[in-house]
Amino acid sequence: MSGHNKWANIKHRKAAQDAKKSKIFTKLIREIIVAAKEGGGDPETNPRLRAVLERARAANMPKDTIEKSIKKGTGELEGVDYQEIIYEAYAPAGVALYIYAMTDNKNRTAQELRHLLSKHGGSLAESGSVAWLFERKGIIEIPKEKIADFEEFAMVAIDAGAEDIIEDDPIQVITAPDMLTEVKDKLAENGFEGEAKVTFIPKNTVKVTGADAEKVLKLVSVLEDNDDVQEVYANFEIDDKELEEIMSKLEG
């Protein structure tokens, strides 16, 4: 599954490069509002809020923007009521897409996604037809240079409750969703600070190459550029070299 992990890492790198762009802030603000609405405004008692605040600070979001977003979520300030919605879809070559959105208008979002999918060779799928292909997991990403002794790191991660460790850059620690905060904190106590989030990992992947690979990546890219879309999960597999070439072309 290295081609899939490489794609996730390229997206991670691109997000870091794009951190000052307003689109990244727009998505993070929505996440903060929804997390605060769901679990309250105190990150000490709201793991979901704590995780998104760490990402917001890493993206250099102003403190004032963060505080206002939290207050909009808790109701202390007036704000937009966002709903979390999953859209299931197919890309070219039978690749499954699990699209996580936050929207204040479900009809608008569905219409926009239907248009983007149709334009790029994809289609919306019936509810439940794609969900079973993905597994909800926690993931902690730690830059490789922060880990001097991988064996020591792996022992700490496994003892803390990690299910799997993917030796890439960044190093990825996979956990059960309800163990994410506990494992992250245990790693941090031992000097291994990382960024944590809940994600959806494909159970199996579909190998795509050539024109199909380019079409799939282009579709995922335009979907993620939509303001209502927070994340697109996909079950494709593309060779690392080809993936890098296509992503460079799309980014250029």
UniProtKB/Swiss-Prot annotation:
It comes from Thermosipho africanus (strain TCF52B). GO terms for cellular component: cytosol. GO terms for biological process: regulation of DNA-templated transcription. Pfam families: TACO1_YebC_N (PF20772), Transcrip_reg (PF01709). Its main location: cytoplasm. This is Probable transcriptional regulatory protein THA_1246. It is found in: Cytoplasm. Keywords: Cytoplasm, DNA-binding, Transcription, Transcription regulation. One of its GO terms (molecular function) is DNA binding. InterPro entries: Integrase-like_N, TACO1_YebC-like_2nd/3rd_dom, TACO1_YebC_N, Transcrip_reg_TACO1-like, Transcrip_reg_TACO1-like_dom3, YebC-like. Belongs to the TACO1 family. It comes from the Bacteria.
